[in-house]
């Protein structure tokens, strides 16, 4: 094998933008909605997008999606172990 081919998952048209929230952003999000991380939807650490970001269990991922009716909306997931 000549070399490892790298594929950037975030360049695919069907994959929305993902990013890891900072500790300050995480705290603000949880306070704003008066929730705990356990109340957020989960995303596994083995998810290709999570791996590409280098996120670890406990991190909160912000996902930015485009919608024809709502414009842009954000949703959040907490990274959990497999």
Swiss-Prot record:
Disulfide bonds: none annotated. GO terms for cellular component: cytoplasm; DNA-directed RNA polymerase complex. It catalyses: RNA(n) + a ribonucleoside 5'-triphosphate = RNA(n+1) + diphosphate. The keyword Transmembrane helix does not apply. GO terms for biological process: transcription by RNA polymerase II; transcription elongation by RNA polymerase I; tRNA transcription by RNA polymerase III. It is an enzyme of class 2 (transferase). Keywords: Cytoplasm, DNA-directed RNA polymerase, Nucleotidyltransferase, Transcription, Transferase. Coiled coil: none annotated. Part of the RNA polymerase complex. Belongs to the archaeal Rpo5/eukaryotic RPB5 RNA polymerase subunit family. This is DNA-directed RNA polymerase subunit Rpo5. The gene is rpo5.
């Amino acid at each position: 094998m000549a070399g490892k081919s790298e594929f950037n998952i975030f360049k695919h048209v069907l994959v929305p933008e993902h990013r890891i929230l900072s500790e300050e952003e995480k705290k603000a999000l949880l306070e704003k909605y008066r929730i705990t991380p356990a109340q957020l939807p989960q995303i596994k650490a083995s998810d290709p997008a999570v791996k590409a970001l280098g996120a670890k269990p406990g991190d909160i991922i912000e996902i930015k999606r485009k919608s024809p009716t709502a414009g842009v909306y954000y949703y959040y997931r907490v990274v959990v172990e497999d």
